[in-house]
């Protein structure tokens, strides 16, 4: 097959881009892309290479290479991206070809010291063969995502699930040996022994993994994970939802063009045959629906923090492509978008049964579709306070604060008190009396009957 430029994309840069494609069909057989800006960025920071993989419905995988490490001070979800590639096949030969193309255009590859990968990356021998002087490690971000997924998959009670997710988030932002050991112990206590091997909890005790991440402060860790979460969501949204690799990559490049903070000099223009899809043609004549969506976009930017707005705007982009209201009632609405059907609870704070809303507690594509259908906009009481723009400064001060033993104890007591109170409120009268008597007996035995304990 002939080597051709990617149909439908023109990347403007100071010198010709390095872009390779095999095949003229919407399904790319192989694809490698690096702009001169990306090449220059990698040349400046080659020491640590972060590899993220995104699969589409056809099973093709997009490899995104990002620079990482203490010297990299670049903001934006895709600002650290230095290479995009889709191998012909995800086997030893296909990956070897992909890495060899990368090395051909990047002489600085010899200075790569560390490569961070996800736990499902199986072709490690190929990676070590192509980068013989680099140490290959699991990335803290991918371990975090792996454990999060397991917590949602395992049949855990909600209080236990919330405790594990909260502890995981706290540990990732302060990955000291002590905190990792605490999380390891918590997993051993909360996860059934038969399912514990699935979690690979021994990763938490591998200090070499965490040395590559531990240099970050608590605030830096929070921003780092948030940025990578948004990056993964963007790639999944644009590339992972379409079986056509060409269309997926065009969407990724379009996002990078529209978000100048990610890559200011990247621009994209479409060929005539691709530039007038039905949805884009209708955009030339704004109607009521489009005006409503514009108002929703404005309300997101006005109410949410920057990262929250970016996540929700990505969800809104899906709504703009395809939305179908399949049922409506006074209490609940059923929203179907593309392949998903989920139940939306519109009363503040709005909630949805989809993973995005359950994980981030932010307005998802289904909630935004509901707002669009009702010609409404986002209201501040529809999302948690920590995601509102007014709370951004207070969050930064909390994330930047130092840990203290007294605060840790206070938080533990507060969480326990809230959980006990919740359990007492949501039980029968008979169960309440039994639980209250048990608590009364525990309190009296602990402090002594000579001192009345207020329960």
UniProtKB/Swiss-Prot annotation:
One of its GO terms (molecular function) is zinc ion binding. GO terms for cellular component: nucleus. A zinc finger (SWIM-type) spans 333-375. Residues 264-288 are annotated as: Disordered. Pfam families: SWIM (PF04434), ZSWIM1-3_C (PF19286), ZSWIM1-3_helical (PF21600), ZSWIM1-3_RNaseH-like (PF21056). InterPro entries: Zinc_finger_SWIM (IPR052579), Znf_SWIM (IPR007527), ZSWIM1-3_helical (IPR048326), ZSWIM1-3_RNaseH-like (IPR048324), ZSWIM1/3_C (IPR045563). Keywords: Metal-binding, Zinc, Zinc-finger. PANTHER family: SWIM-TYPE DOMAIN-CONTAINING PROTEIN, ZINC FINGER SWIM DOMAIN-CONTAINING PROTEIN 1. This is Zinc finger SWIM domain-containing protein 1. The gene is Zswim1.
């Amino acid at each position: 097959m002939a080597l051709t430029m990617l149909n439908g994309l023109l990347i403007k840069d100071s010198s010709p881009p390095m872009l390779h494609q095999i095949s003229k069909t919407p399904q790319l057989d192989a694809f490698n892309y690096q702009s001169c800006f990306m090449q220059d960025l990698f040349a400046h920071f080659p020491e640590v290479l972060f590899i993220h993989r995104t699969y589409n419905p056809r099973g093709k995988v997009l490899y995104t290479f990002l620079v990482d490490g203490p010297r990299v001070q670049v903001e934006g979800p895709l600002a650290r991206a230095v290479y995009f590639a889709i191998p012909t096949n995800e086997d030893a030969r296909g990956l070897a070809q992909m890495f060899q193309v990368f090395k051909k255009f990047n002489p600085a590859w010899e200075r790569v010291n560390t490569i961070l990968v996800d736990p499902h990356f199986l072709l490690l021998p190929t990676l070590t063969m192509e980068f013989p002087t680099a140490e290959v490690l699991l990335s803290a971000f991918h371990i975090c995502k792996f454990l999060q997924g397991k917590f949602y998959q395992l049949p855990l009670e909600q209080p236990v699930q919330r405790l594990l997710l909260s502890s995981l988030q706290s540990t990732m932002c302060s990955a000291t040996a002590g905190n990792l050991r605490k999380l390891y112990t918590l997993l051993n206590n909360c996860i059934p022994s038969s399912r514990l091997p699935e979690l690979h909890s021994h990763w938490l005790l591998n200090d070499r993994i965490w040395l590559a991440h531990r240099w970050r402060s608590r605030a830096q860790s929070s921003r780092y994970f948030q940025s990578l979460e948004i990056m993964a969501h963007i790639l999944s949204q644009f590339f992972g939802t379409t079986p056509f690799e060409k269309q997926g990559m065009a969407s990724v490049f379009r996002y990078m063009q529209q978000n100048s903070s990610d890559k200011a000099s990247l621009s994209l223009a479409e060929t005539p045959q691709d530039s007038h899809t039905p949805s884009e043609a209708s955009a030339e004549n704004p109607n009521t629906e489009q005006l409503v969506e514009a108002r929703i976009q404005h309300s997101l930017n006005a109410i949410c923090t920057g990262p929250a707005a970016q996540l929700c705007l990505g969800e809104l982009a899906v709504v703009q492509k395809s939305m179908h209201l399949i049922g409506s009632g006074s209490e609940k609405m059923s929203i179907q978008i593309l392949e998903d059907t989920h139940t939306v609870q519109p009363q503040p704070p709005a909630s949805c049964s989809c993973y995005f809303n359950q994980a981030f507690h932010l307005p998802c594509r289904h909630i935004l579709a509901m707002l669009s259908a009702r010609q409404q906009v986002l209201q501040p009481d529809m999302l948690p306070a920590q995601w509102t723009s007014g709370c951004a400064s207070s969050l930064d001060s909390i994330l930047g604060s130092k840990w203290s033993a007294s605060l840790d104890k206070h938080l533990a007591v507060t969480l326990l008190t809230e959980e006990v109170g919740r359990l007492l409120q949501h039980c029968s009268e008979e169960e309440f009396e039994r639980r209250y008597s048990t608590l009364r007996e525990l309190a009296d035995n602990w402090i002594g009957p000579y001192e009345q304990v207020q329960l």
